[in-house]
């Protein structure tokens, strides 16, 4: 270990260090005037771009439409190496990491998988920076019984290249594959059942993670939904345990991003408390700014009224060129995108104290205060969600991203009123990745095409979760666990119950919308007219202009 990972490896040269200043804690104030983030359409000739899968639309909006933009990009930490060192040695609710370490101890490090960030970061990933610093400290203490586990939960296994992108080449070469590997939720010998919570929820988790002397969790927080008590139960759990918080009854009582009103997070907290009774955990959480797009896509980081001549030219050339490209080429281009995200905070120690600070820093970057709900919510659906990195946004994942995540990007109450209408643009298709999404395709063909009744769908869940073929593909190939197909469908359940209509604009294959329970429109204006049938002739309309990811705090 010492030869491959010498002391001080976590230190980076000045040229590698990120620039600007470290964020102050969230103080409840916006860093920019809200009126710069919320605009109203004043002229019917104005046009706005909408994400449309691996492409874009250029649309007019009705006069009076409220357009909500993400906050500007916050400056990153000036000296990341120093910030990580400070976090590890000045933790919250815990002794310093160096004080927890002793020669001969057994240490397990877990890290968030490729579902974060979106898109993947330009190297170095913040998890790499944290891992290198942690491993340097372990090396200094003479600790060599170290395993590093990708906390994939029931997601598909990460490929060697995907793991290397997150952890960096030095960590990868030193530990892969014997001591750097994906969590396996179906490896019975390396899973341990710890009992039940006081609500009867099974607590089942990776054996190595709880039978070590110290578990270190390295997190990347992209939204308030993640991190905290969610990290270990989801990332290192099994179907037997995860089913308790990934089900329609719980999700119907869950605000994904507002954990104060989330039954899912209450369940995760109960499960995580049992886990923490069995192993000492040192949590390291990080946040990043919203620098989502590389230099050649910077026009997507700006509002239309801020576009330069070059931005407009670049956008329209890209939009029209993408129209004539084959789908496979468009997907390859978009999935090659690497975001220039930079770290804005790092904090370590006790799970609850750490996560409180993480959420404060997320709010500083992501929250836009908004007055009032709307009747019709417009959104452009991009090519990428948490479950299709380097893959395909199949029909099930469209439901998870639209009625699931996009609908839930709020605090307090949804941006659209109950009984309102969600309209999104996406070239809806019937494509599934042949390796990653085997259970999704079968779920779509054999369950959703027959019924959308939730009770009937839930009755199929265990069949998918225990199917030997899906289990083998999850363990030996790169397919999602069988249970994840129905789980992804459940993700949109609250919105499906809450809204009167969901309308998809310009689908490529219209009958897919019928299977999903959506209506279709050939244009955005047609969709708005269709929505008026249920919300009335003079609706309030809001265009939720994302990505970058942000949250509306609705009053």
Question: Which stretches of residues belong to each language-model region?
Answer:
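Short internal beta-strands
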Residues: 142-155, 423-426, 502-506
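Glycine-rich phosphate/diphosphate-binding loops that line cofactor/substrate pockets in enzymes
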Residues: 92-113, 140-143, 369-373, 415-417, ...
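Histidine-anchored nucleotide/phosphate-binding helix
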Residues: 118-142, 404-415, 423
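Acidic low-complexity segments
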Residues: 144-196, 551-552
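Extended hydrophobic packing segments that form well-structured cores
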Residues: 24-76, 88-89, 490-555
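Conserved, well-structured core segments that form the ligand-binding/active-site neighborhood
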Residues: 173-373, 380-383, 403-408, 414-416
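Domain-start "cap" segments at the beginnings of catalytic or binding domains
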Residues: 23-86, 311-341, 368-387, 495
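C-terminal catalytic subdomain
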Residues: 391, 397-499
